Design a protein with these regions (language model features):
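Mobile cap/lid helix-loop segments that gate and shape the active-site cleft of serine hydrolases
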Residues: 68-79, 213-220, 224-270, 276
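Catalytic nucleophile-loop/oxyanion-hole region of alpha/beta-hydrolase
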Residues: 118-119, 123-126, 140-184, 326-330
């Protein structure tokens, strides 16, 4: 299944009106053996493999990793978006400030329904914003294989790949903190859609690695110091129950009989008083991931006494990244900057 097909169907099984369209023809070569292009970071930046050997819990894929460009029906901010598919060898790419350095670092999780990665719209373009602010930005190209049970990845027994990659990357950032001029106590996460869910997942699954420790990086804490889930999915009980019915492996989501399905938290996101501070953003007209995902997470965080700031907007839909339009929601990066000052991560 291509990125375009997936996103047109809707990450949560709901028809999508604002997401990536049909796959463009990326090669004039008609041979069946022709290779599709692969994503590479901008000059001067290198993808760093996060596992020294094979990644744990490997999943089958239909072919090699490849990149695709969105069709004309999905040009957020007037530009196409780039997706990366069939990722089996996860990497992270570090973008460091050249001048002023606050010591803050953000690990970025692009969205894509755990089946593809919106690598520019919800990845590298975050770094275009953060690096000039003196913040180190690390884009995680986590595993998405487009096969197997749904979700294709996440903190579920069926396929914990993305959370394993997130835990590993967080440990690597702290291990190399001095080398990369990062304060190890100021490392947060920011993710979109499924990447927003992954932000919440690592913020509630950090006490123990999901994999056998590999080296010194896995002795470092993988708890984020702050989290920024942007239009996140999979966070309400209703969303978790929908997830449980997908794919070939069905499973039961344990919950109280009288639980509010829309506003109760997904049991796979066990919020505690130690969950890091959160900034949440979502739109009322998000037809991909319901606004109740943010509301359910907000309520759970408040009940646990975790500092949380939430912004809800009437319009804006889903998958807009940082691309500015006339809609007020697209000014959200300024709100995050203010919030980072509020929680003491950066100074005025």
């Amino acid at each position: 299944m291509t990125m375009a097909t997936l996103l047109l169907k809707g990450i949560l099984g709901i028809p999508m009106r604002h997401l990536i369209g049909a796959l463009c023809v990326l090669s004039a070569v008609t041979s069946l053996s022709a290779q599709k292009p692969v994503w590479k970071p901008s000059p001067g930046h290198t993808q760093i493999p996060i596992w020294p050997g094979a990644a744990p819990d490997p999943q089958p894929v239909r072919g090699p990793e490849f990149m695709e460009i969105s069709g004309k029906d999905f040009h957020p901010g007037g530009r196409p978006a780039t997706g990366v598919n069939n990722v089996t060898r996860p990497t992270m790419t570090v973008y460091s400030p050249r001048g002023n350095n606050t010591g803050v670092a953000v690990l970025v999780f692009p969205g894509g329904g755990y089946q593809t990665l919106a690598i520019d719209l919800e990845g590298t373009e975050v770094c275009d914003w953060l690096v000039p602010k003196g913040i180190t930005c690390v884009v995680l190209k986590y595993r998405v294989t487009d096969v197997g049970p749904y979700p294709k990845s996440g903190p579920y027994p069926e396929s914990p790949m993305a959370l394993e990659d997130a835990q590993r990357a967080m440990g690597l950032i702290r291990l190399h903190a001095a080398e990369w001029h990062i304060d190890p106590h100021k490392v947060g996460v920011l993710g979109f859609s499924s990447g927003g869910h992954l932000s919440a997942a690592i913020s509630t699954h950090y006490s123990k690695r999901l994999y056998q420790p590999v080296d010194a990086a896995d002795k470092e804490s993988c708890r984020p110091d702050f989290q920024v889930p942007i239009y996140p999915g999979h966070l309400s009980l209703a969303a978790a129950q929908w997830d449980a019915r997908q794919g070939t492996k069905k499973f039961v989501v344990p919950h109280a009989a009288n639980a509010d399905r829309d506003l109760s938290i997904n049991p796979e996101v066990p919020v505690t008083a130690q969950t890091p501070p959160a900034f949440l953003l979502q739109n009322e007209d998000d037809h991909v991931d319901n606004v109740n995902d943010s509301l359910a997470y907000y309520i759970a965080l408040k009940k646990a006494g975790v500092p949380v700031e939430m912004h809800l907007y009437a319009q804006g839909g889903h998958a807009f990244g940082l691309r500015r339009t006339k809609l007020p929601v697209t000014a959200w990066p300024q709100l995050v900057e203010t919030w980072l000052k509020t929680i003491g991560m950066i100074q005025d």
